[in-house]
Amino acid sequence: MQKAHRMLVGACAAVATLAFAGTAFASYAPKLVVSSTGGTALGGATRIGVVVGAADDATANTTIYVPNGYAVGTPTPGTDLGKVTATAAAADLGGAVLPLTGELDAIAPNATTQAAAQSCGITPTQTWDLHLSAAGQTLDIPLFVVAPLAPETALGFTQKLVVCLPPPDVPVGTPGRSVFGAKLLSATFTSSAITQPTAAGDYRWTSLFT
């Protein structure tokens, strides 16, 4: 059990290095952290977190690759999958860092999420929603479950989690601009639909930030 936990930490370090190498000419070094909600227990829900530096460029797209061994269920739309906490720097509020809280829900696709998926260039098999609130505003960010491509499957990944974020660094009034001109700094969510392996082993998570 401890071996599996150590490899998760190692995978996060490798992901951070990969993300940095891919953006060597920009200020951008995001980090991915994956943990268990049950400590070293096997088979429980999964907690996923991302962190981006306050001085880093804004994130547009995040793809998280789920390794073989983890099971991704198909919850019924309307199911509460877990809690979400996040922080974002709001340009319209002088750069104030806003704490956001909410929940991760399984939802049925709708016109808004379908447009978001098309903009991301993906065909999701499931649609989840990061339902957040801060400063009297509600923010819904689609999180898509996407089947991996054949080369990704060959590398040992069973699913992809994809989030495409609205731009914060465009003029006020631009269609699709993020609320408050908010730039994501961190987000952590728990999903009961992503269960950990039932056997100890080496499980490497990988991510791509752009």
Language-model segment annotations:
Residues 25-210:
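Ser/Thr/Pro/Gly-rich, low-complexity intrinsically disordered stalk/linker tracts of secreted
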Residues 13-14, 24:
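Cleavable N-terminal signal peptides
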Residues 1-12:
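Bacterial N-terminal signal peptides that target proteins for export
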